[in-house]
């Protein structure tokens, strides 16, 4: 019995100490302590300690009685049997540097900011220089005159503005600044209104409504001058004018010097064939189509090895592309075989008035074997503007020589012939008469002293030497007003009716009648 009374007394003492600890905790919370447990538990006042000791000293087992259960909190302490301190009743206690806010528990990561991970830096070096990366480039087109004159940034709109309109002048520029300067210079010189910039999507190249179409002035028909022939019932439909901007001298010199300086580093889709005065480009698979087009317009291509989808030549003239496609589908059994385009071309010629000669090409198409590129070497480039004419004369002679060699080939199939382009391929059968006439017609139109847009005595002398090697006679007496007066020694004795049996064919305006010995 005494043991029970002692235990009850100890329980009472512990309850008193527990009340003291709770009081200290409440005081610490009220004072906003920064960290729990920073302040040590201090002893109570001497008066309270004396009360505890006196109670223990005067305690006797007979005085211990069971304490009735309290149903309500007392004045000095709470009922230990009631849950008076629940999590929802607890005041937030500062336990860290960041203030604890109840709303933070509803935020992601309880309101704690998560630092972003830094991007992993790649240690893999790029295979090619950043300058070699191709970026999209927008060209600007100036339509100087016509019903839709203006500055365009889309070739589709420019083509619609110039297609079928006679006398329209237009030009391509790399930047809007250059285009604006050229347009302002033109309007100032012609004293016309300033040309507006027409972005893509805003060009109104057709009537806006049916009423406007009815009120629009009718299109003037071309005046026909007939001499003894019946006028056609309707005007012929205008042919589609494909946009082929004239190459400038600056563009040509840039490509020329690029070919001379190229050493094969940085681009494995190109290699050059270097001669003493000129370097020609050879384009392999995945070459830049825009560069192929510009080099083609400059007459600086020797060979093209296109992919199966012909993406490298997609900017070449449409008829040339169609001829290549027909060769793949109709002339070879395995359409997956690689092909080549071997080009012999002249180069452009400029005078003070501007461009006087666009390159003329003879293109051979064939099945390509394994491509073994030649080593590209950086060559010395000393050419000046005044040397371009001499270079054009040299390439013109080589062009005529390669064109005359077609007469020695007995098995040729003509894929396409145009005013300034001849495309052919080898054939397993002999050349038919139709293809032979096409070659002769092209030679008649191209081979002359005026090949380069002006009369050139050097071309005439080259033709004279070439004809003499084949047993003919071709003499140039003198040049009068830019035209060569040419007379064949055997012209007087030959028949006057019908075409002369000649292999060296000259343009009709330069040679009234020519004849030479036919060499088999």
Swiss-Prot record:
Region (Disordered): 486-520
InterPro entries: Ribosomal_bL9/RNase_H1_N, RNase_H1_N, RNase_H1_N_sf
A biological-process GO annotation: regulation of translation
Spans through the membrane: none
Location in or out of the cell: Host cytoplasm
Superkingdom of origin organism: Viruses
Gene Ontology CC: host cell cytoplasm
Cross-referenced Pfam families: Cauli_VI
Keywords: Host cytoplasm, Translation regulation
Disulfide cross-links: none
Role: Enhances the ribosomal termination-reinitiation event leading to the translation of major open reading frames on the polycistronic viral RNAs.
Family affiliation: Belongs to the caulimoviridae viroplasmin family.
Miscellaneous notes: The inclusion bodies are the site of viral DNA synthesis, virion assembly and accumulation in the infected cell.
Protein name as it appears in the record: Transactivator/viroplasmin protein
């Amino acid at each position: 019995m005494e043991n029970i009374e002692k235990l009850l007394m100890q329980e009472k003492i512990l309850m008193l100490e527990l009340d003291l600890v709770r009081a200290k905790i409440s005081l610490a919370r009220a004072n906003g302590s920064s960290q729990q447990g920073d302040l040590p538990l201090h002893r109570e006042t001497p008066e309270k300690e004396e009360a505890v000791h006196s109670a223990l000293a005067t305690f006797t087992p007979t005085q211990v009685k069971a304490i009735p259960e309290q149903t309500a909190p007392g004045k000095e302490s709470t009922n230990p049997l009631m849950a008076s301190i629940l999590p929802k009743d607890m005041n937030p206690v500062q336990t860290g540097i960041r203030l604890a806010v109840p709303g933070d528990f509803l935020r992601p990561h309880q309101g704690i900011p998560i630092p972003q991970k830094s991007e992993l830096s790649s240690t893999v070096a790029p295979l090619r220089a950043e300058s070699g990366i191709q970026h999209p480039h927008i060209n600007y087109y100036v339509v100087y005159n016509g019903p839709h004159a203006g500055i365009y940034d889309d070739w589709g709109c420019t083509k619609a503005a110039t297609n079928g309109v006679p006398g329209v002048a237009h030009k391509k520029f790399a930047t809007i600044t250059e285009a604006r300067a050229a347009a302002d210079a033109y309007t100032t010189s012609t004293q016309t209104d300033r040309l507006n910039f027409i972005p893509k999507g805003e060009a109104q190249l057709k009537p806006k409504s049916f009423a406007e179409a009815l009120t629009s002035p009718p299109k003037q028909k071309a005046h026909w001058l007939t001499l003894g022939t019946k006028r056609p019932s309707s005007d012929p439909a205008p042919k589609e004018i494909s946009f082929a901007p004239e190459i400038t001298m600056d563009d040509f010199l840039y490509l020329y010097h690029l070919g001379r300086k190229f050493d094969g580093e940085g681009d494995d889709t190109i290699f050059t064939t270097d001669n003493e005065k000129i370097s020609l480009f050879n384009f392999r698979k995945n070459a830049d189509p825009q560069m192929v087009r510009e080099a083609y317009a400059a007459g600086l291509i020797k060979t093209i090895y296109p992919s199966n989808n012909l993406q490298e030549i997609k900017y070449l003239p449409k008829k040339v592309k169609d001829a290549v496609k027909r060769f793949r589908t109709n002339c070879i059994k395995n359409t997956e075989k690689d092909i080549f385009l071997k080009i012999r071309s002249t180069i452009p010629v400029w005078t003070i008035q501007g461009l006087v000669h666009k390159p003329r090409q003879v293109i051979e198409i064939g099945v390509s074997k394994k491509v073994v590129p030649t080593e590209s070497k950086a060559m010395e480039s000393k050419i000046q503007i005044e040397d371009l004419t001499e270079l054009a004369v040299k390439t013109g002679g080589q062009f005529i020589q390669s064109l005359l060699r077609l007469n020695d080939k007995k098995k040729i199939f003509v894929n396409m012939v145009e005013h300034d382009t001849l495309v052919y391929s080898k054939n397993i059968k002999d050349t038919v008469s139709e293809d032979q006439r096409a070659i002769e017609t092209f030679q008649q139109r191209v081979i002359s002293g005026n090949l380069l847009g002006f009369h050139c005595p050097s071309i005439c002398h080259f033709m004279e030497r070439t004809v003499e090697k084949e047993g003919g006679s071709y003499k140039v007496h003198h040049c009068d007003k830019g035209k060569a007066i040419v007379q064949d020694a055997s012209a007087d004795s030959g028949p006057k009716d019908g075409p002369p049996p000649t292999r060296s064919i000259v343009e009709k305006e330069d040679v009234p009648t020519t004849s030479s010995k036919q060499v088999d």
